[in-house]
UniProtKB/Swiss-Prot annotation:
Function: Specifically hydrolyzes 7-methylguanosine monophosphate (m(7)GMP) to 7-methylguanosine and inorganic phosphate. The specific activity for m(7)GMP may protect cells against undesired salvage of m(7)GMP and its incorporation into nucleic acids. Also has weak activity for CMP. UMP and purine nucleotides are poor substrates.
Protein's gene: Nt5c3b-b
Keywords: Cytoplasm, Hydrolase, Magnesium, Metal-binding, Nucleotide metabolism, Nucleotide-binding
Pfam families the UniProt entry points to: UMPH-1 (PF05822)
Family membership: Belongs to the pyrimidine 5'-nucleotidase family.
Descriptive protein name: 7-methylguanosine phosphate-specific 5'-nucleotidase B
Binding locations of Mg(2+): 39, 41, 228
């Protein structure tokens, strides 16, 4: 029996029968064996609303009044140069990798110049009304109530990401975030970023220093992986034993050019779908017996 939610017109599947088999096996394993690994920007957060692009964690800072007009122009220039390269279907991940390092590094350098103040971040997040996808409350609350761990692996800004979820009222103890976190001095002024740089195409075990997380939940061998780029496909690399994994890709941009490429790697591809309906539908089904 196919789940009704998989009949949405935004849904594309590489192998519908194989997918249904995976869903059934995950359901049989029960919620005690399940974990969720997800990207944040444009995966848990919306790509657009009413035809307007929604901001990423970086965009929220870029467009805020804590950045000078000159700084904003420079950051917009970086976006205009590097974003088309990030999603270029003709470039390989190997070609994109150094370009993403350049982009993130240049953006971070511009942030340092702005002397960003820690105590202004909460207000900055409120201003653009950064939006989580429709159905976010059911998603976060259902996982929390069923004690299913949610691992958010983001190339965005951890401080901003956490504030968005917190202000939405769904930041629960079952949520673990690995991202680029700001480092502030004793006066609350940005001096750098902590740890290794995380960008779109190195979201794998190479930057996962805190492997204790996956050791603690090593019995959770069934995974739902949520992403919006081909770089997100490696987010489960830190999991030592995987029995079943369902990869769900949100394809937001260059849909016609990238659909086939996404279908080669993701089990489910969602075309311009601003909801978490499919994810929630699968979660409700696989946890129904529990």
């Amino acid at each position: 029996m196919r789940l009704p939610v998989l009949g949405k017109d935004t849904v594309r599947m590489r192998d519908p029968e194989g997918l249904q088999d995976k869903i059934t096996r995950i359901q049989r394993g029960g919620q005690e064996k399940l974990q969720i690994i997800s990207d944040f920007d444009m995966t848990l957060s919306r790509f657009s609303r009413n035809g307007e692009r929604c901001p990423t964690c970086y965009n929220i800072i870029d467009n805020s009044n804590i950045i000078s007009d000159e700084g904003r122009k420079k950051l917009k220039c970086l976006f205009d140069i590097y974003y088309p390269l990030e999603i270029d279907p003709k470039k390989s991940i190997e070609e994109k990798y150094p370009l993403m390092v350049e982009w993130w590094s240049k953006a971070h350098d511009l942030f340092y110049e702005q002397r960003i103040q820690k105590d202004r971040l909460a207000q900055v997040v409120k201003e653009p009304q950064a939006t989580l996808r429709d159905g976010y409350d059911l998603f976060f609350n259902n996982l929390y109530q069923r004690e299913i761990p949610l691992f958010i692996f983001s190339a965005g800004i951890g401080d901003v990401l956490e504030e968005i979820i917190r202000q939405a009222g769904v930041f629960h103890p079952n949520t673990k975030v690995v991202s680029n976190y700001m480092d502030f001095d004793d006066n609350g002024i940005l001096t750098g970023f902590k740890g290794d740089l995380i960008h779109t195409y190195n979201k794998n075990s190479s930057v996962l220093k805190d492997t204790e997380y996956f050791k603690e939940i090593s019995h959770r061998t069934n995974i739902l992986l949520l992403g919006d780029t081909l770089g997100d496909l490696t987010m489960a690399d830190g999991v030592s034993t995987v029995e079943n994994i369902i990869k769900i890709g949100f394809l937001n941009d260059k849909v016609e050019e990238l659909t086939e490429q996404f279908l080669q790697s993701y089990d489910i591809v969602l075309l311009r779908d601003e909801t978490l309906d499919v994810v929630n539908g699968i979660l409700q089904f696989v946890t129904a017996k529990n």
